C-alpha cells in the first residue's frame, strides 16, 4: 500500500522446486550435470532449468571451469515496482502488461582460478568471461495513459531477445587471519536484439538503460 498515492499492489507468489545433480570427478577432471524444476503459481506450466559444469585442474594452483546454466524470471511485480517515481514532473508507476510471459536465460561462462603465495601472503586471481542470451526479455515503456489515480503507467512487457556478455576479474590477498584485501572489476555490454522504445519522446535504444558497462 503506497500511502499518499492511494495505490494498492496485491500479489501472492508461491514457488515449488526440485533440484537434482550428479558429479563425477578425479584429481584433474570434474563433470557435473543437473537441473531444476520450478512451478511458479503465476506461470501455468512447469519450468526446467538445466545446468552443466566441466572442471579441469591444470595444476594444483590453476583451475579451469566451463559452465552452462538455464534460468528464468517470473512475470511478477518486483520490489522496485512498488515505488512511485517521477518522470517529466509527472508521477509514474510500473504495471505488468497483459499476457506477460516469463523471461528465460541461457548462460555460458569460462573461468580461470589461480592461486600463488608470495612469502606469507596468499593470493588468488579469478578471470571469467560470460555470455547470456535472454528470450522474452523484460523491458519497460511509458504509456500515454494513466491509472484510476491519475498516475502515468510504466509498462513492463516482453521484448524479443537480448544478450549480456563481458569479463569479470577478481583478486584477493590474505596477509594474515586478521587482514585481507579483495577487489574486482566487471566489464560488460547489455543489448536488446531489436531497439526498444521506452518513451514516445525518446529514440528507441538497443542498449539497456540504467545498466553500467563498467563496475
Residue ranges with predicted function:
Residues 25-30, 130-133, 151, 155-215:
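Gram-negative outer-membrane beta-barrel transporters
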Residues 27-28, 61, 117-123, 178:
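Short loop/turn motifs that connect adjacent beta-strands in outer-membrane beta-barrel proteins
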Residues 9-41, 45-51, 171-173, 178-189:
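Surface-exposed extracellular loop regions of Gram-negative outer-membrane beta-barrel proteins
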Amino acid at each position: 500500500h503506497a500511502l499518499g498515492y492511494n495505490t494498492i499492489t496485491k500479489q501472492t507468489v508461491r514457488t515449488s522446486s526440485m533440484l537434482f545433480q550428479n558429479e563425477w570427478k578425479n584429481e584433474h577432471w570434474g563433470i557435473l550435470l543437473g537441473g531444476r524444476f520450478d512451478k511458479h503459481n503465476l506461470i501455468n506450466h512447469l519450468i526446467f532449468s538445466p545446468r552443466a559444469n566441466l572442471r579441469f585442474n591444470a595444476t594444483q594452483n590453476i583451475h579451469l571451469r566451463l559452465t552452462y546454466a538455464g534460468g528464468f524470471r517470473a512475470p511478477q511485480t518486483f520490489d522496485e515496482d512498488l515505488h512511485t517515481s517521477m518522470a517529466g514532473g509527472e508521477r509514474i508507476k510500473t504495471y505488468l502488461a497483459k499476457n506477460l510471459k516469463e523471461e528465460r536465460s541461457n548462460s555460458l561462462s569460462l573461468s580461470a582460478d589461480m592461486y600463488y603465495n608470495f612469502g606469507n601472503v596468499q593470493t588468488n586471481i579469478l578471470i571469467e568471461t560470460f555470455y547470456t542470451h535472454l528470450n522474452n526479455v523484460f523491458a519497460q515503456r511509458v504509456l500515454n495513459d494513466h491509472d484510476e489515480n491519475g498516475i502515468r503507467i510504466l509498462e513492463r512487457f516482453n521484448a524479443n531477445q537480448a544478450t549480456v556478455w563481458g569479463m569479470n576479474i577478481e583478486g584477493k590477498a590474505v596477509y594474515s587471519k586478521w587482514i585481507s584485501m579483495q577487489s574486482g572489476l566487471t566489464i560488460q555490454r547489455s543489448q536488446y536484439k531489436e531497439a526498444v522504445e521506452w518513451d514516445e519522446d525518446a529514440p528507441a535504444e538497443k542498449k539497456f538503460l540504467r545498466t553500467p558497462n563498467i563496475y
